[in-house]
Design a protein with these regions (language model features):
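Soluble catalytic regions of membrane-associated enzymes that act on cell-envelope
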Residues: 8
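Non-catalytic, membrane-anchoring transmembrane segments at the edges
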Residues: 2, 14-33, 37-220
Length: 220
């Protein structure tokens, strides 16, 4: 059959933004690295030049998604956070890795989700309004507010977070069958699933897939 390159590899499990871009839109990030970042000088000409190269690369990557100021700012904030990750990372080498994973994962998730507001908004003013409602005046935190925090939705969100963070992705689930061309950007540790679950052509798996399919159809 046809094997395509990996393009997304559980990006929301990333513990920092550098790792996020190794996992997110792998073909695009590889293109930006090989044809923009490295030709600009990469990290070979000092920290300041590296940070400038990162910022330029991410801004151009933002414009690639669309010709609007929201995409420019989205790329810019990603470039700045990447530069900060490289700069401050050396100061945390003595911190236990397990602690870095927890704190880094939460910070990365918060930043990426906040930045998506810029990506999805039609203009800067709308993005600022959304962010103000999220952080400056978060009415959704009010007790009894009829927003997203209903009892049933809280359970669904917690379940989905656990699924996204702990269960293997499709490449890991079907890894024995080599469904895609592995990316060299990911290290072995990043490829290891937290839960060892592998698909097999068995009656049990067929039944599970049928249950999931029926659940999806009935939820339409």
């Amino acid at each position: 059959g046809i094997r395509l390159p990996e393009n997304f590899f559980s990006p929301y499990q990333s513990t920092n933004l550098v790792e996020f871009w190794r996992r997110w839109h792998i073909t695009l990030s590889r293109f930006l690295r090989d044809y923009l970042y490295i030709p600009l000088g990469g990290n070979k000409k000092g920290e300041i030049r590296r940070n400038i190269n990162l910022l330029l690369t991410m801004v151009i990557g933002g414009i690639w998604h669309g010709a609007g100021w929201t995409f420019v700012v989205w790329g810019g904030v990603h470039g700045l956070w990447l530069a900060a990750t490289h700069h401050f990372g050396k100061y945390f080498e003595a911190v236990p890795r397990c602690n870095l994973k927890v704190v880094g994962g939460l910070l990365t998730f918060w930043f990426v989700v906040s930045a998506w507001v810029l990506f999805r908004s039609p203009d800067i003013a709308t993005a600022v309004n959304y962010l103000q409602n999220m952080y400056a005046q978060p009415e959704w935190l009010a007790v009894g507010h009829p927003g997203i925090f209903k009892d049933r939705l809280i359970g669904v969100m917690v379940a989905l977070i656990l699924v996204c963070y702990y269960l293997p992705n499709t490449q890991q689930l079907f890894g024995d069958h080599h469904p895609s061309i592995p990316s060299a950007q990911l290290c072995p540790e990043e490829r290891t699933a937290k839960v060892n679950l592998v698909w097999r052509p068995t009656i049990k798996w067929a039944g599970l897939v049928m249950i999931l399919l029926l659940t999806c159809i009935l939820s339409l």
